[in-house]
């Protein structure tokens, strides 16, 4: 999928197992850029070692419940989104909801339309697969991300714990409903 409305042509494609190293690199770099200034180096190092190693990303790519989309410009990976079919927290009213686990753009391109393109593709994919509700967790101190999600129609429905290294943090749980696609049944298609 090629997207207009960003500064350079942007391609969003589903990641494959061959993308594990590329996925690992963009996942860790965007996470560190986003949360490094507000967390200790020790907690950041511990979390990254637990979450972003190439073998971990390869395992996630291999799981049918995960879908990872990479955003690319001129051959460079500049962002990504990860969706996951997982049990939603109790505050999410739809038990068949799909989660946007992560959605990030490279720091030097934040505000250039990459996040917007990834969000649109994520919502489209969720709807195509029969999901009526999308939910996500966002750190309660990440005001920029919360504002972004609110612009996309997400509402705050509760909280959940997030362990970042040794630090116990609180994520806001946000959700939104999706329009039903014509001719779509009431059941969800599992990726």
Predicted regions mapped to residue ranges:
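Short acidic N-proximal helix/loop "leader" segments that mark the beginning
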Residues: 1-6
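Extreme N-terminal starter segment of soluble prokaryotic enzymes
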Residues: 9-11
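Acetyl-CoA-dependent GNAT
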Residues: 14-20, 24-37, 42-108, 116-121, ...
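C-terminal "cap" of GNAT-fold acetyltransferases
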Residues: 94-98, 132-146, 150-191
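Active-site acidic-Proline motif in GNAT/NAT acetyltransferases
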Residues: 106-108, 112, 140-141
